[in-house]
């Protein structure tokens, strides 16, 4: 069974809007036993929408469209699909009345342009949009299911969960794939794949996903026997125990948070280059107050001087150590971490862009780490956070 997504919107192709509907749809389908087969993004141009829709209709059992069913002149997805399938577009008087009452309740008159949202393709079923005024649409055409859904994510996702997934479960069998992950740090993707190929069992479905210093190894637990899978995971641990971040598909900061809770440790942080990004990730997790004692963002030299109550060193390895040791004393945490660095794109120090200095202290010892990272300013900042997390995990272990 093939499922395709047709995303409509020039703003998606221009990069003005990120297509979060694609990722949320893929995740929701997979968690319910289905796989999104393909996705096509098209501009707000009728002929292109029609052409790509008909291509998808030919090769898929289910087509989901998002976008182009609003009240403006560039919203014409329903119109185009009706043209492609030779269907009439009829006014749903009941829905129109409901829309008008919504406007009246706010003391406003509904613009005439909104009437098009109440138009429904001939023979279609209206899907209740609990977050907006444009209803979703379900068409059954030649035993193929066509869902025409709104583009705003807060409207799209509930319709997928409440309307699309239940219908798919009623009419199609779920996939037998069962993915799980192993997360690696400080590994080159090609080298990692080459080494794993030496002991990978025949038939094991693997994929490598690299991002910001972390490589996710995705594997299908159902593609080989349980015994062979267990042997494979043991081999992974034997060969890469020093590089494995997690056996779960979780953010690196979550792995750190879990470890701190497990060990009943508290943490204080001093951030410069990362500007509070590391502590921000940690506080996203419920129960963060039991782990994170304090976080100081010290961006300027003046702020660092004030924190230390002394002059600061031009040597960032020394300075990072001073900041970490001051933090653990000041905040009485089990562990402290400080991170300094040069993010660029124009150097603001004598250090090269991408040079990162991390210090971790636990009252008994302080350990320094020096990393040389590449990429844009945002890449370096993100990778700095991940390196700090990785260094801290290894310090604790």
What annotation goes with each model-predicted range?
Residues 3-5, 146, 267:
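Conserved hydrophobic helix-helix packing surfaces used for dimerization/oligomerization
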Residues 1-39:
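Glycine-rich phosphate/diphosphate-binding loop of Rossmann-like nucleotide-binding domains
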Residues 29-42, 290-294, 367:
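Short beta-strand elements in bilobed, periplasmic/extracellular small-molecule ligand-binding domains
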Residues 46, 226-397:
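Short alpha-helical segments enriched in small residues
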Residues 140-213, 218-223, 228-229, 246:
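Accessory alpha-helical/coil subdomains and C-terminal extensions
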Residues 66-91, 236, 240-247:
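Flexible gly/pro-rich beta->alpha loop and the following alpha-helix that scaffold active-site loops
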Residues 48-51, 58, 75-171, 313-315:
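Proline/glycine-rich low-complexity loops and linkers
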């Amino acid at each position: 069974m093939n499922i395709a997504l047709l995303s409509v919107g020039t703003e998606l192709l221009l990069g003005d809007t990120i297509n979060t509907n694609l990722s949320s749809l893929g995740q929701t389908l997979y968690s319910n036993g289905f796989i999104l087969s393909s996705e096509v993004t098209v501009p707000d141009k009728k002929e292109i929408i029609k052409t790509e829709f008909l291509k998808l209709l030919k090769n898929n059992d289910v087509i989901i469209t998002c976008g182009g069913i609003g009240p403006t002149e560039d919203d014409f997805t329903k119109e185009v699909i009706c043209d492609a399938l030779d269907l009439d577009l009829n006014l749903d008087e009941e829905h129109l009345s409901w829309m008008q009452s919504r406007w009246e309740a706010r003391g406003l008159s509904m613009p005439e342009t909104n009437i098009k949202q109440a138009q429904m393709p001939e023979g279609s079923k209206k899907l209740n949009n609990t977050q907006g005024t444009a209803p979703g649409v379900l068409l059954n055409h030649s035993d193929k299911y066509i869902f025409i859904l709104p583009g705003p994510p807060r409207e799209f996702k509930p319709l997928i969960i409440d309307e699309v997934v239940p219908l798919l479960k009623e009419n199609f069998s779920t996939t037998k794939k069962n993915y799980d992950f192993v997360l690696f740090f400080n590994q080159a993707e090609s080298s990692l794949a080459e080494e794993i190929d030496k002991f990978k069992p025949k038939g094991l479905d693997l994929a490598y996903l690299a991002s910001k210093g972390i490589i996710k190894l995705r594997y299908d637990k159902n593609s080989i026997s349980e015994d062979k899978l267990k042997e494979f995971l043991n081999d992974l641990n034997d060969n890469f125990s020093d590089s494995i971040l997690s056996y779960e598909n979780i953010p690196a900061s979550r792995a750190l948070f879990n470890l701190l809770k497990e060990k009943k440790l508290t943490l204080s942080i001093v951030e410069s280059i990362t500007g509070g990004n590391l502590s921000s990730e940690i506080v996203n997790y419920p129960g963060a107050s039991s782990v994170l004692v304090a976080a100081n963002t010290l961006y300027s030299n003046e702020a660092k001087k004030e924190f230390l109550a002394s002059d600061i060193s031009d040597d960032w390895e020394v300075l990072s150590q001073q900041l970490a040791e001051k933090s653990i004393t000041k905040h009485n945490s089990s562990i402290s971490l400080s991170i300094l660095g040069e993010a660029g794109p124009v150097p603001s120090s004598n250090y090269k862009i991408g040079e990162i200095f991390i210090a971790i202290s636990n009252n008994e010892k302080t350990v320094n780490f020096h990393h040389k990272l590449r990429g844009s300013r945002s890449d370096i900042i993100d990778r700095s956070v991940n390196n700090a997390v990785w260094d801290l995990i290894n310090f604790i272990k």
